[in-house]
């Protein structure tokens, strides 16, 4: 019997997509499900960006673009990095892809050889370890619990480094926790990395603009780190453009050239119309970005305050993104009389089936004691969801 490759067989399916699918199935049955499992803004793409896309269609931007993306888009990204982040790049140091997910995967693929180790702080985005495994590398997971705000320390980083370490994947603001590394915390990690000059940092900054503490901090801005850091970013979260699929890397030219070589053999350049929309996003008014950020901050305050009232939940105060990641292991071993809650995935399924609230268990994020809730939804949905969760958990003894 013909079988799929061992490489594919080793991959785990996406837990976030699986929960979203299960939620959709219940909704199709007419059940009122509040979906807190979705990792995308609930806002619409700003009108001026949509108008730019319409114009691109009328102007016949319908052919292949350069593999790395149109020069106009890459120049707009160069200007964004200089004006917003104080970082100097050239267009040759930018490569655009079909979303930031592909940008991360591209970078992993061009850096990692079989047996190489990639350090991944946990909790992590579910796809990071799978990308490393796809490249036949070894994910080295460094756990950071809620007591340290889900952020690793310099000592933990130092202890994880071996002669096989090729890269560190660092996500700030974080999916799934919403934690944000301060400038001082990044400097501490950088001091460790400077002792190991061959390690590349893959800095996933896709949630840069959904930030509640002020200026975004990039590890690339620290002296000595820019030439060994690959910034990953894109338009999906900040501009409510998840379906447009435009991400990018900014980094050393030798890595960018390798990424272009790889991408040229399996997807080529990203969608031409989406690129023109992304160009408009970066060069146009940033007021919609700030309006969405303010709405997310208000929702963050609401869900944190409500979740603190749920017995057995331990809650931090996320400083970015749009996720809450409460510790819920208090409920492990409890039962409603028909089922036993053994782990976070059991709890997430219980909440979906009983409370009709979709969350994602933390096991796939490297944190089996937590569940992820997205507050990229209305204030009314947030309030009702936490009420349902509280009522459902009260039935567990």
Task: Annotate the PLM regions.
Residues 37-40, 55-73:
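A glycine-/small-polar-enriched, mobile loop at the entrance of the PLP active site in fold-type I
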Residues 2-4, 8, 12-14, 19, ...:
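PLP-dependent class I/II
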Residues 64-97:
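Conserved N-terminal alpha-helix of the aminotransferase class I/II PLP-enzyme fold
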């Amino acid at each position: 019997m013909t079988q799929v490759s061992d490489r594919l067989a080793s991959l785990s399916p996406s837990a976030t997509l699986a929960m979203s699918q299960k939620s959709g199935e219940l909704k199709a049955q007419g059940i009122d499900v509040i979906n807190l499992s979705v990792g995308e803004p609930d806002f619409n793409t700003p009108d001026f960006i949509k108008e730019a896309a319409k114009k691109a269609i009328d102007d016949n931007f319908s052919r292949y673009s350069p593999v790395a993306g149109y020069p106009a888009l890459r120049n707009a990204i160069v200007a964004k990095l200089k004006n917003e982040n104080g970082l100097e790049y050239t267009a040759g140091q930018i490569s655009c892809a079909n979303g930031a997910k592909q940008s991360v995967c591209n970078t992993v693929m061009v850096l990692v050889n079989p047996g190489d180790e990639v350090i991944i702080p946990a909790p992590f985005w579910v796809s990071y370890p799978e990308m490393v495994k796809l490249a036949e590398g070894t994910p080295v997971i460094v756990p950071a619990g809620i007591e340290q705000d889900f952020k690793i320390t310099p000592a933990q980083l130092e202890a994880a480094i071996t002669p096989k370490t090729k890269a560190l994947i660092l996500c700030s603001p974080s999916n799934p926790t919403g934690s944000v590394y301060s400038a001082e915390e990044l400097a501490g990690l950088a001091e460790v990395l400077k002792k190991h000059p061959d390690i590349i940092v893959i800095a996933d900054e896709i949630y840069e603009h959904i930030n509640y503490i002020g200026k975004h901090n990039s590890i690339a801005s620290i002296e000595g780190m820019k030439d060994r850091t690959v910034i990953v970013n894109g338009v999906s979260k900040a501009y409510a453009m998840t379906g447009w699929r435009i991400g990018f890397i900014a980094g050393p030219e030798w890595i960018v050239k390798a990424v272009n070589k790889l991408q040229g053999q399996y997807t080529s350049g990203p969608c031409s119309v989406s690129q023109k929309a992304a160009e408009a996003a970066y060069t146009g008014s940033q007021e919609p970005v700030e309006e969405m950020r303010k709405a997310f901050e208000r929702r963050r305050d609401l869900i944190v305050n409500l979740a603190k009232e749920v017995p057995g939940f331990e809650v931090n105060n996320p400083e970015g993104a749009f996720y809450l990641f409460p510790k819920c292991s208090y409920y492990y071993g409890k039962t409603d009389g028909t089922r036993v809650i053994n782990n976070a995935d059991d709890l997430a399924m219980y909440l979906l089936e009983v409370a009709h609230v979709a969350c994602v268990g933390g096991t796939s994020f490297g944190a089996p004691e937590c569940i992820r809730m997205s507050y990229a939804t209305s204030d009314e949905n947030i309030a009702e969801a936490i009420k349902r969760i509280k009522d459902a958990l009260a039935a567990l003894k």
